[in-house]
UniProtKB/Swiss-Prot annotation:
Belongs to the UPF0181 family. It comes from Haemophilus influenzae (strain ATCC 51907 / DSM 11121 / KW20 / Rd). InterPro entries: UPF0181. This is UPF0181 protein HI_1434.2.
Length: 52
């Protein structure tokens, strides 16, 4: 596993996404997994982008 540093705003958005998934009936653990996986994918793709 690797660490992803998120801004406060990004953390808030992640919490909101988790809460939305839970409101749709998804368990908290599964909601966290879904959001964490999405964040890892975004972070991985950001790392691949060449810096200017």
């Amino acid at each position: 596993m690797f660490d992803i540093n998120l801004t406060h705003e990004q953390q808030q958005k992640a919490v909101e996404q988790i809460q939305e998934l839970m409101a749709q009936g998804i368990s908290s653990g599964e909601a966290i997994q879904i959001v964490a996986k999405a964040l890892r994918e975004i972070h991985k793709n950001d790392k691949k982008t060449p810096e200017n």
